[in-house]
């Protein structure tokens, strides 16, 4: 239902936010950007 869809959206947002945060961190560490 609606709750499940909302949970999936929130999970997707959290996942992509975490990914970009990790990428930014890796970029700072090894200066690859």
From Swiss-Prot:
GO terms for cellular component: extracellular region. Keywords: Amphibian defense peptide, Antibiotic, Antimicrobial, Disulfide bond, Secreted. The keyword Translocase does not apply. Disulfide bonds join 27-33. The keyword Disulfide bond applies. It comes from the Eukaryota. Its main location: secreted. InterPro entries: Antimicrobial_frog_2 (IPR012521). GO terms for biological process: defense response to bacterium. It is found in: Secreted. Expressed by the skin glands. Pfam families: Antimicrobial_2 (PF08023). Transmembrane segments: none annotated. Belongs to the frog skin active peptide (FSAP) family. Brevinin subfamily. Has antibacterial activity against the Gram-positive bacterium S.aureus ATCC 25923 (MIC=9 uM) and the Gram-negative bacterium E.coli ATCC 25726 (MIC=9 uM). This is Brevinin-2PTb. It comes from Pulchrana picturata (Malaysian fire frog).
